[in-house]
């Protein structure tokens, strides 16, 4: 059994895949396996994976017949893994050479710690140099060790980030949430924190490559799947006695997200096909209907533009579109 399994879900990642794999194969901790699953890429990603696997037996490669989304792809990788500890690295990101060693050492020596966060560095593209040397540390709340429940609470609004190494048993018990093609992996982070006795940090760096092609920045319909992912997390929080105190805070987050995503739709609906418009409106309506009004704070429901108006979906839509029109006119006058 290797000390660490690194899960890498790959989809059309040939541009940055070499940098990712090189950073993993050059780790100071050698007792590792790198489990790469190609999610039916249409570029040269699979060929690159096979090229690297032929040179280093620590790299395992599998491929999916059809595109299945990042959570399912990671679950396939998780099922292939055998390491004592598990972490994931996105195929366009990279690690400092000591990242796996430092995080594994914490888990080896701190028996009550089940999860170790990396030092999260955001690498932004310098358009002049064409490099990712513009780097900044994620603004995470500093801590040494905290309970898993506290970490779950802090991750609801990302006061701590979600990039970590975890003990294998926990990850197998709670695989990646597949309730949504995107964003549901964020739910898994919160569940992993909740399932951990204690959560710690290490100095090993995870470099997140922020660029226009990143899944979280792509100008497409993926953002609306956050509504599905949030519903799944709500169900989890409601189903455990020790997380129910978080339900009201999270429900207010959900409500603000519904309004924010309606605004996104208001700005872009003309660019969508009729089928896409119907899909977005269906998701927005389902989320609007599912909000538990008893959990919402009055400051988030009494303002124009934020009143649920549960008696009528049409009335709610009319309120939103008038509110967004007035807001746009106000912004133009500034």
Identify the role of each PLM range.
Residues 23, 38-47, 66:
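A conserved acidic beta->alpha catalytic loop
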Residues 270-334:
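Membrane-interface aromatic/basic loop that binds lipid-linked glycans or pyrophosphate carriers
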Residues 31-40, 60-64, 90-91:
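Short beta-strand/loop segment that forms part of the nucleotide-sugar
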Residues 12-26:
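Short, well-formed alpha-helical segments that are part of the catalytic scaffolds
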Residues 180-182, 189, 198-229, 233, ...:
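Nucleotide-sugar-dependent glycosyltransferase catalytic core
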Residues 64-81, 88:
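Glycine-rich, basic loop-to-helix element that forms the pyrophosphate-binding segment
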Residues 91-198, 209, 213-218:
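Donor-binding/catalytic cores of nucleotide-activated saccharide
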Residues 2-5, 33, 187:
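Cell-envelope/extracellular polymer assembly enzymes that use nucleotide-activated donors
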